[in-house]
Amino acid sequence: MFYWLIDLSNTVPGLGIFKPLLNVFRYITFRTGGAVVTGALFVFLFGPWIIDNLRLRQGKGQPIRADGPQSHLVSKKGTPTMGGLMILSGLVVSTVLWANPLNPYVWIVLAVTLGFGLIGFYDDYLKVTKQTHAGFSGRTRLLLELLIALAACYALTRLGREPFSTALVIPFFKDVALDLGWFFLGFGAFIIVGAGNAVNLTDGLDGLAIVPVMIAAASFAMIAYLAGNAVFADYLQINYIAGAGELAVLCGAVLGAGLGFLWFNAPPASIFMGDTGSLALGGMLGSIAVAVKHEIVLAVIGGLFVLEAVSVIVQVASFKLTGKRIFKMAPIHHHFEQLGWTEPQIVIRFWIISVMLALAGLSTLKLR
């Protein structure tokens, strides 16, 4: 919305004198900063009202896993879920205000984010109303996610300003790319769905998921800005994607809304993100990575999410094949709880790992 102030200064009589001031809205960096502040302020202001309403409507709050750490049955009992509504509302408001409304990449990523958020919301609704840890059918959920992801990948190949590359770029190697052709649709959908569920699995402790999401969003804000700038993209020898820089504004909105949410999700949490938030944020990260052609880099920057997902896959596979469990409990953050680590120790150490992985992922931009 603010982006249109540039045109108004040129067309509306009397606003010409403000053109030098309004010209700052041309700059993605300025609007990204504005998106961060707006997203944070929105959640700060409306967060308490949302929490009170969710607590009133949910009653007993999110059901706690009976097979999890016994301390959770006491410390987390009665805490409302669906906190992702706070993040998504702040994200959407901030993006609408600060992003270029004519940019197709912004709308494609927003569609994935809200689509995954809607799936997560329904899952949370079933859990709260039935007071069970299981939501609706896993197969149904995966199918819906896959359909949304496939539609988004197809839209990327058709709605971009220039022909969208279907090549898979290999980090650390100069001019090395694998053209996937139509297989790009399946690969891109796998990245988006995988990211959504990986973040979902990570969201098991107070503050554990939101900070790594913010770190990843900040990292991809930088990547999107560079990929959308022809000069920087040429210098770094990464794919130039016209218009992709606008995704930095969306990443800024996520960072701001995440900061606001962390205020209420910090231990002991007043609200949980729920599938509403974790699925949406993961899907958003996946779709941005696909849009800016840094899918493999997402696996590095979001390595913590990959670790959490792999721990579950390995645990399930091991138990089915051998009848034995490799970890005391999966996802892996619960394994460390069973080893005696306190919740703050796990959360802060995982944050540190996320920062290190983000730095490693960003280093791939230059090391080619």
UniProtKB/Swiss-Prot annotation:
The EC number(s) this enzyme carries: 2.7.8.13
Species annotation: Nitrobacter winogradskyi (strain ATCC 25391 / DSM 10237 / CIP 104748 / NCIMB 11846 / Nb-255)
Membrane-protein topology: Multi-pass membrane protein
Record's catalysed reaction(s): UDP-N-acetyl-alpha-D-muramoyl-L-alanyl-gamma-D-glutamyl-meso-2,6-diaminopimeloyl-D-alanyl-D-alanine + di-trans,octa-cis-undecaprenyl phosphate = di-trans,octa-cis-undecaprenyl diphospho-N-acetyl-alpha-D-muramoyl-L-alanyl-D-glutamyl-meso-2,6-diaminopimeloyl-D-alanyl-D-alanine + UMP
GO CC annotation: plasma membrane
GO biological process: cell division; cell wall organization; peptidoglycan biosynthetic process; regulation of cell shape
Entry-linked HAMAP family: MraY
Transmembrane stretches, start-end: 32-52, 79-99, 102-122, 142-160, 176-196, 207-227, 244-264, 271-291, 296-316, 345-365
Protein name in the entry: Phospho-N-acetylmuramoyl-pentapeptide-transferase
Pathway: Cell wall biogenesis; peptidoglycan biosynthesis
Reported function: Catalyzes the initial step of the lipid cycle reactions in the biosynthesis of the cell wall peptidoglycan: transfers peptidoglycan precursor phospho-MurNAc-pentapeptide from UDP-MurNAc-pentapeptide onto the lipid carrier undecaprenyl phosphate, yielding undecaprenyl-pyrophosphoryl-MurNAc-pentapeptide, known as lipid I.
Highest classification ranks of the organism: Bacteria, Pseudomonadati, Pseudomonadota, Alphaproteobacteria, Hyphomicrobiales
